[in-house]
Amino acid sequence: MTELVLILVGAILVNNFVLVQFLGLCPFMGVSKRIETAIGLALATTFVLTLAAMCSYLLQRYVLVPLDLEYLRTIGFILVIAVVVQFTEMLVNKTSPLLYRVLGIFLPLITTNCIVLGVALLNANKAGYGFLESGINGFGAGLGFSLVLVLFAAMRERIAIADVPKPFKGAAIGLITAGLMSLAFMGFSGLIKP
């Protein structure tokens, strides 16, 4: 049980996939202008990350390794991610049509979000990660992505009404803010011993 908590905390804070491993930067910068949109995408991405991590483990364990097809891992994982994203898109459209319209093109673009493929590949490469550990790591990666995305969106909303010098407006102040957030998350680096 302690190991599962360490995997979860490690994925959320210590090895945050956005601020420490620099995966998922496209939606991080692109969807963080409004907090409502950021929350919606964060929830959808967390769901996709968790489900894709578990499905990728099953594909790796019960299809690719027994049939000696490990060279098809990346293509297989992309296929699994595409199916999970389509399922998520149908679920969001059915449960919240407003959120579906607000997210627009960003929902199907979760398929190309490198954090989803990165988590699946890292889970496959980690020796000793079983089905539950892969799911917990995917869920933790989703929570870490959500935490960072929502915090960044809240800061960008505040920055939008602030008096920012002209050379720093737009992407420049966004990248500076992301860099400061990354420095703050580096403070968690010694929290869990490898």
UniProtKB/Swiss-Prot annotation:
Protein's membrane topology: Multi-pass membrane protein
Enzyme Commission numbers on file: 7.-.-.-
Pfam families noted in UniProt: Rnf-Nqr (PF02508)
GO cellular component: plasma membrane
Protein localization: Cell inner membrane
Top-tier EC class: translocase
Chain ranges passing through the membrane: 4-24, 39-59, 72-92, 102-122, 135-155, 172-192
Annotated GO biological process: electron transport chain
Translocase in keyword set: yes
Superkingdom per UniProt: Bacteria
Self-association and partners: The complex is composed of six subunits: RnfA, RnfB, RnfC, RnfD, RnfE and RnfG.
Functional summary from the UniProt entry: Part of a membrane-bound complex that couples electron transfer with translocation of ions across the membrane.
Family note: Belongs to the NqrDE/RnfAE family.
Name of protein: Ion-translocating oxidoreductase complex subunit A
Lineage of producing organism: Bacteria, Pseudomonadati, Pseudomonadota, Gammaproteobacteria, Pseudomonadales
